[in-house]
Amino acid sequence: KVRRAQDAVLRTRPFSETLQKVLGGLIKRLKADAIDLPLLTERTVKKVVLVVISGDRGLCGSYNNYIIKKTEARIKDLKAEGLDVELVCVGTKANVYFRRRETPVRKFFNCPQAPSAENASSITDELLADYLSGEVDRIELLYTRFVSLISCEASIRTLLPLSPSGLETDGDEIFQLTSVGGQFVVKSETVPVAEPEEFPADMIFEQDPLQILNAILPLYLNGQLLRTLQESVASELASRMSAMSSAS
């Protein structure tokens, strides 16, 4: 199951890299033309939505506890700045925990064991609509990054607004589960930042570049969320495998 989760991440990477290059190039071109891009505009932050990815079940060591504690710490920091915070919970464990403590939960989604583009799209469509309407000023992803079969790391990534380049891949790692001497080991490879595609100044687009950007952005955001779902599921599976091994 961990191998399948790994393969899912690796299969989507070439498409993601190409999409990031085109996206970066379009943003660069539109900025040069002084076109306003709402998804890149930093605005006064009043409300922050935290998308918290946890599991639907227990018996997976401290996997759920780590992400819940990370979320509580982030909520505390944001409230100390005088900001309103709401949650979008992906996974039953976080949803039940925070609702019992009367933390505002905006929406709940089950966490699929084999995340698909459709799963991610159902979440990102709502998040994007809320951001563009001005109802939400910042959206962050809280997920569990896969480090090794016995180690995972609760992490935070900003989904919206986008960074000035539109790219959020710096420091990304791809994990690969391999077998050495009959034992499972995890090898990780740091992913280089995808440099923006350089479009010639006299290049003519069949469609307006802004229309192209508006069509690509949902795909990009969907890919970012799908990646975090896949990483979280792999971390949960590894934590469950480790917990079962310790119990036996």
Segments and roles (model prediction):
Residues 1-248:
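C-terminal beta-strand-loop-alpha-helix "lid" module of Rossmann-like NAD(P)-dependent dehydrogenases
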